[in-house]
Amino acid sequence: MTKLVRGLPHPADFQAPPSDSDRARWTQADAAARPTRLRRLRDRMAAADVDAYFGIRSEHMRYLTGFVLDDGEDRVAGNSGRFLVSAEEVVLLADSRYRLQATAQAPGARIENTTYDLPAIWPNLVKSLGARRVAVEAALVSHQLWGQLQAAAPEVELVEAVGWIEADRVVKEPAEIERIRAACAVADRALASIVRRVRPGQTERELAMALEWEIRTGGADALAFGIACLAGSNAALPHGSPSSSEVHVGRVLLFDFGAMVDGYRSDMTRTLFIGEPNPRDAAIYEIVAAAQDASIARLDSALRGDQTVPSGREADAAARAVIEAAGHGEHFGHGTGHGIGLATHELPSLSRAGADDPLPSPTVFSVEPGIYLDGVTGVRIEDLVLFDRRRDAVERLTNFPTDILTVGV
């Protein structure tokens, strides 16, 4: 059974914030890795018989070029931040606000000045690369922009490219794992500080703001995503937003949040109890904890050689079976987990819609089963885990306890 713990963790229990030397080492590691990253993309381009790749997602641009255009949100880049890769060149499109930054961060790239009228410069861009067929991030480029580019250079064929860079980013390099680990430690310390200050009568917004302050002053460059702080029945909203609702004794308090460190993100959910847990919520917590343990145990068994490496769908099924057996299958609608890195949601997907292929390695993903009773209560427990076939066990990167914790009293 999950322990009921009355003592609370201390921020000093967790890894210290990254140092300047850590960040310098990560920058060097990225620079050394980029030629290999670009080669993999160019191999895909050659296999698809395309002359260039047109990308617009900010984390893809950072991964391939080093140019950082990121405000802490997963997003599609604007006109500054679009890029082209050919067999010989990398071209960054940047307006006057970012030219100096792009030149410094991506020294091997050609920087092209752009305005908000990309179609106007598109013909000369593709001509300068000798491109007759261009692969385009089809899931991200709008129908409108696709049509504009076709009309601007009708002699250039646009080809849909789906998941080309994502497929490479799912396998994490050592320096990427280090940064995710550091982001997890920032989150661990921040929550350890906040749980000591929770009191009945505080609002969700007050606690979310306090947690954000701890994250930003504790070594993070930004939030990984907007904080969810949900009290009582609001915890039944898997992606709810903080409100003026107050914390009350006898109810749950759910935090879902993450830190971003040098571009890489963490993601953690903890469900706490204000005072003594009521029997219903405590029982639900036990089920969710058992479901998470079952999924991680399935991963562990593969690394020990007891079972084959599971697919994302199988890892999800292990957690889902526990919740369904407890009679709450209809109260667990989302997937068990998702990959994470430069974006909050990446491959692999641990869900009923996940791939049937064995999970890649090494990779980092969340394991986050939950049970949600509409208008009543909700419980989710989320950890990031490192799945690495070279290891003997799955490593939890988020280390804040998953025991039943009572706070606010």
Predicted segment positions?
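Active-site neighborhoods and metal-handling regions in enzymes and metal-associated proteins
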Residues: M1-V409
